[in-house]
């Protein structure tokens, strides 16, 4: 009987890292995403979320993008998604507001 290797996205529970549900919400004149809910690995840095968001919005490197957690503060790019969720998660989501102009602070 032949065995097959599971796909990379189907790791065993011992190997799998927890996922965090991230909900993106636009602010001001920023483009609205058609699908705004995604899962991110808890161990990823917030910088990975920013890069993913830029890709989803089709932004160039020189385009401005400001991100906020719960419309309150701008997280550091080296914060982990998991720590942000543990501290600021709302109703099972990490809410990330985004704008192409500075909205707060």
UniProtKB/Swiss-Prot annotation:
GO terms for cellular component: Atg12-Atg5-Atg16 complex; autophagosome membrane; phagophore assembly site membrane. There is a cross-link at residue 105 (Glycyl lysine isopeptide (Gly-Lys) (interchain with K-168 in ATG5)). InterPro entries: Atg12, Ubiquitin-like_domsf. GO terms for biological process: autophagosome assembly; autophagosome maturation; autophagy of mitochondrion; glycophagy; piecemeal microautophagy of the nucleus; protein transport. Gene3D superfamilies: Phosphatidylinositol 3-kinase Catalytic Subunit, Chain A, domain 1. Keywords: Autophagy, Isopeptide bond, Membrane, Protein transport, Transport, Ubl conjugation pathway. It comes from the Eukaryota. It is a peripheral membrane protein. It holds the Pfam family APG12. One of its GO terms (molecular function) is protein tag activity. Ubiquitin-like protein involved in cytoplasm to vacuole transport (Cvt), autophagy vesicles formation, mitophagy, and nucleophagy. Conjugation with ATG5 through a ubiquitin-like conjugating system involving also ATG7 as an E1-like activating enzyme and ATG10 as an E2-like conjugating enzyme, is essential for its function. The ATG12-ATG5 conjugate functions as an E3-like enzyme which is required for lipidation of ATG8 and ATG8 association to the vesicle membranes. Belongs to the ATG12 family. Forms a conjugate with ATG5. This is Ubiquitin-like protein ATG12. It comes from Cryptococcus neoformans var. neoformans serotype D (strain JEC21 / ATCC MYA-565) (Filobasidiella neoformans). The gene is ATG12.
């Amino acid at each position: 009987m032949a065995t097959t290797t599971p796909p990379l996205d189907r790791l065993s529970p011992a190997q799998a890292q927890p996922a965090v549900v991230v909900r993106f919400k636009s602010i001001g004149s920023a483009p609205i995403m058609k699908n705004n809910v995604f899962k991110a690995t808890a161990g990823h840095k917030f910088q990975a979320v920013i890069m993913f968001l830029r890709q989803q919005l089709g932004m160039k490197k020189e385009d401005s993008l400001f991100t906020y957690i719960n419309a309150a503060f701008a997280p550091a790019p080296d914060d982990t998604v998991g720590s942000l969720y543990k501290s600021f998660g709302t109703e099972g989501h990490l809410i990330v507001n985004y704008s192409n102009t500075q909205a707060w602070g």
